[in-house]
């Protein structure tokens, strides 16, 4: 199984996207909402993102999709907090949040290999 971590300044955005992806692919992909600061405010929280990634220990690959600049910085900071095993299987993806996460989830149903997912994401703009 793969995991997809959704990072946005808005919890509502990541929860809505999580709902949409789960509706399409079911529970075959572990989708995690990491939007907002964790206390209902807009913003990002690197500690929360790292804690959410830590729930993915059973995943073969973990992909992080972010919305805008500082969300990417928070995701990068979260990676610095991970142990080596989790870090080695975690990738921040340079793709649009909605289209990228959706494409990765659907592609994982066809071919869950990291190479296949990354290749399919090259078509997402």
Curated annotation (Swiss-Prot):
Query: What reaction is this protein's catalytic activity?
Result: dihydroxyacetone + phosphoenolpyruvate = dihydroxyacetone phosphate + pyruvate
GO MF annotations for this entry? Answer: phosphoenolpyruvate-glycerone phosphotransferase activity
User: What triggers or suppresses the expression of this protein?
Assistant: Repressed by GolR.
Q: Which UniProt keywords apply?
A: Cytoplasm, Glycerol metabolism, Kinase, Phosphotransferase system, Transferase
User: PTS EIIA type-4 domain location, by residue?
Assistant: 1-125
**According to the UniProt entry, what is the EC number of this protein?**
2.7.1.121
Query: What is the predominant subcellular site recorded for this chain?
Result: cytoplasm
Task: List the GO biological process terms.
Answer: glycerol catabolic process; phosphoenolpyruvate-dependent sugar phosphotransferase system
Q: Name one GO cellular component term.
A: cytoplasm
Where is this gene product found?
Answer: Cytoplasm
The family database entries (InterPro entries) matched by this protein are listed as:
DhaM (IPR039643), DhaM_N (IPR012844), PTS_EIIA_man-typ (IPR004701), PTS_EIIA_man-typ_sf (IPR036662)
Q: What does this protein do?
A: Component of the dihydroxyacetone kinase complex, which is responsible for the phosphoenolpyruvate (PEP)-dependent phosphorylation of dihydroxyacetone. DhaM serves as the phosphoryl donor. Is phosphorylated by phosphoenolpyruvate in an EI- and HPr-dependent reaction, and a phosphorelay system on histidine residues finally leads to phosphoryl transfer to DhaL and dihydroxyacetone.
- Which family does the similarity line name? Belongs to the PEP-utilizing enzyme family.
**Additional notes on this entry:** Unlike the carbohydrate-specific transporters of the PTS, the complex DhaKML has no transport activity.
What interactions and quaternary structure are annotated? Homodimer. The dihydroxyacetone kinase complex is composed of a homodimer of DhaM, a homodimer of DhaK and the subunit DhaL.
**The name this protein goes by in its record:** PEP-dependent dihydroxyacetone kinase 2, phosphoryl donor subunit DhaM
Q: Record the organism.
A: Listeria innocua serovar 6a (strain ATCC BAA-680 / CLIP 11262)
Q: Which gene encodes it?
A: dhaM-2
